[in-house]
Amino acid sequence: MRVSKYLLSTQKETPANAEVISHQLMLRAGMIRRNASGLYSYLPTGLRVLRKVEAIVREEMNKAGAIEILMPMVQPADLWVETGRWEKFGPELLRFKDRHNRDFVLGPTHEEVITDLIRKEVSSYKQLPLNLYQIQTKFRDEVRPRFGMMRSREFLMKDAYSFHLDVDTMNETYEAMYNAYSNILTRMGLAFRPVLADTGSIGGSMSHEFHVLAQSGEDLIAYSTGSDYAANIEKAESPVPTEPRGAATEELCLVDTPNAKTIAELVEQFDLDITKTVKTLIVVGASEATPLVALIVRGDHELNEVKADKLDLVASPVEMAPEALIRDAIGAGPGSLGPIGLNIPIVIDHSVSVMSDFAAGANVDDKHYFGINWERDLPLAQVADIRNVVEGEPTPDGSGIYAMARGIEVGHIFQLGTNYSKSMNATVLDENGKSQVLLMGCYGVGVSRIVAAAIEQNFDDRGIIWPEAIAPFSVGILPMNMHKSHRVTDIAEQLYKDLNEAGIDVLLDDRKERPGVMFADMELIGIPHTVVIGDRNIDAGVFEYKNRRTGEKQDIPFDQLLDFLKNAVKG
């Protein structure tokens, strides 16, 4: 490709409304342009990267035995009513009517459509297992689209759905998809971690997320220093204490604490060990019989709302109770709450169950109890894992301790079981002629999100540093004063021809531009390998080569350059 015939829409200045580096660089490098909130057009450079990501995804899905199809972006609302998600999904589901007043949605996902398709097309166990995928545009009406392609309203996604009659083949397909996703990200040259994950609104049992590691990642990943164990912070299991509860050494004491509204203030004013304090959080209960539930974690720990959401007593999704409701029921406000004398159900974290001589609110404003001990001052409450893990704690596999990293979720695989097939009556006849509800798996990759995540992991102060496999161009040719030197022109054109014939994506900057502008554009758009051609190089019989990632420069003799670049591009 010649720059003179190409839409290279680079920008020097960082757009003011771009919050994260991938958004900034995708705009500056001329990859995307905003059309409306959360809606973007891909310019040539951006589309080249997107298509390379898409091609790798497609190749690995095909190798794993999945079959490509294409489903409509517009979906009939009847299917969503059938699964109950018409009401559950919320305002992210864009709903509209056609000219005949029939309800439709703009698809954020395709479980309903694929299940409807399979129940009509598959009738016998002999047709199973089956794994179908598509690469299709999705739309989610995010309340606040932000971060460019990281959280846009319209995005490109690969979603696959598998159908089974037995758990064994579902597990086999799940493992195949796990390996395919690992291969996809490995081929793209990205540092990533698969992590155990919560199934969220899609539902199901087994679930893994695939995270591209980046300091800007929204998700916190807890992983073992001694094994492959890793989990989203929402899913990471807290260790169950192995040491017995310490004996009581203090008397229960009611203390005035007028200026201690938070754990931090309580600890500072009374010189307490924070691990000897607890936080009492009041959430909405699951029934009229239990309108409020108290959740108690140690003072230095944080409540994990995903874990709390799974408690039978707690309403889903978890909702903190309003202060007025708390005061009506308990007689005190947040900051003065604790387990003694509490007239609502209590669930405590494992770490709280082994505490002794601890401090908590007294359920009277501006008062706390010090020296609280279980089974002396109050009965032991229901115990569950309801907190986030912290760095340095032992991991559940016993092979190491927790460390933390930030990641950007780009893939998610689920075992859905019968969540959708049962509600939509997707059944087949087994080998005995009996009707069986299909088991399902669901496997998603954010194709456009991978592009942004790759930038978040690969950039410097000059621009993007693309991994080889997804770079828009592999080689950039920079002829110095091309329009003034026939020698430079001839050699640049010959190299351009040779690289094209070798199947290497090459960009020839044939503009009448200053060298500084040409260098800056090549570095901004992240071309991995650049070759500089000038009269001085020609006189010396060498090309000047520069590696974008390492910054290494070297002179390559004319007769060696083509082989050198072929090897460099192959990695």
From Swiss-Prot:
Catalytic activity field: tRNA(Pro) + L-proline + ATP = L-prolyl-tRNA(Pro) + AMP + diphosphate
Signal peptide region: none
rRNA-binding is among the record's keywords: no
EC category name: ligase
Pfam families tied to this protein: HGTP_anticodon, tRNA-synt_2b, tRNA_edit
GO BP field: prolyl-tRNA aminoacylation
An example Gene Ontology CC term for this record: cytosol
Record's function text: Catalyzes the attachment of proline to tRNA(Pro) in a two-step reaction: proline is first activated by ATP to form Pro-AMP and then transferred to the acceptor end of tRNA(Pro). As ProRS can inadvertently accommodate and process non-cognate amino acids such as alanine and cysteine, to avoid such errors it has two additional distinct editing activities against alanine. One activity is designated as 'pretransfer' editing and involves the tRNA(Pro)-independent hydrolysis of activated Ala-AMP.
Domain notes: Consists of three domains: the N-terminal catalytic domain, the editing domain and the C-terminal anticodon-binding domain.
Subunit structure: Homodimer.
Name of the protein this chain belongs to: Proline--tRNA ligase
Originating organism: Shewanella baltica (strain OS195)
